[in-house]
Amino acid sequence: MANITSVSDKREIGINSFFSKVGFYISLLKPRVMSLSIFTSFVGMIIAPGFITIYEGALIILAISIGSGASGALNMWYERKTDLLMERTKNRVLPMGLISSNGALIYGITLSVFSIYLLYYVANFLSASILLVTILYYIFVYTIWLKKRTPQNIVIGGAAGAFPPIIGWTAVTGSISPEISLLFILIFLWTPPHFWALALYKSDDYKKAGIPMMPLVVGNKKTVSLIIAYSLTPVSYTHLRAHETVLALVC
């Protein structure tokens, strides 16, 4: 009887360990960031002039979400030592040693390749190419090159987060059109104030990690001014475009 209980306990521990591991790898995908990519790419698909089936649409969203998650995994792999220094990130799975760094790297690369191939298979070469550029841009331009070198890191690097609606659009149409530029610009302009607000709140964290976020370089007061300016710009831009549309309809 004792042996049966022991085997049962071991099986239960093994099952719990498996699901814990799955949870750790899911957290590497940065689900909250991934949800924004899913939403904006879906909007890009919906407003695109073209027709796709629900099945195709689901696979396109799946490919984009996997690509976004793969970027997050590779980002956390590269920043695993930096994350140890920050209160906000020290409890992530890599700094805590819950999964191996090699496992995270292989996971991120595998998902990247799979997402690009899946999008190419279900949609077209152009959308798959833009997804590839987005992943490479986020990892090499933002994470590796810009993040620890300039306070403009999120201004330039934020373009990576603005690509999903273009990917969704091109997955449906097979081409890039000026119409989708509005959504790209809105997300591009929204990204810096969002991260600067976080940097104001977590400036000590960024200082310890050696990341030159805007508040550490120009001070809180100027950062707040920049946040206001960047926040008002999209409003002004959309108002202008709406005004132009009304005039075009009237005339």
Spans of model-derived segments:
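Short, Lys/Arg-rich, polar N-terminal cytosolic tail immediately upstream
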Residues: 4-22
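Interhelical loop and helix-boundary elements at the membrane-water interface
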Residues: 22-33, 93-104, 141-160, 213-225
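The first (N-terminal) embedded transmembrane alpha-helix
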Residues: 30-44
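Membrane-embedded alpha-helical segments that form the functional core of polytopic membrane enzymes
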Residues: 47-80, 129, 136, 140, ...
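Functional transmembrane core segments of multi-pass inner-membrane proteins
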Residues: 52, 158-199, 203-204, 220-221, ...
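Solvent-exposed interhelical
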Residues: 72-109, 114-115, 191-235
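Intramembrane alpha-helical segments
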Residues: 101-171
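Conserved small/polar residues in nucleotide/adenosyl-binding loops
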Residues: 238-245
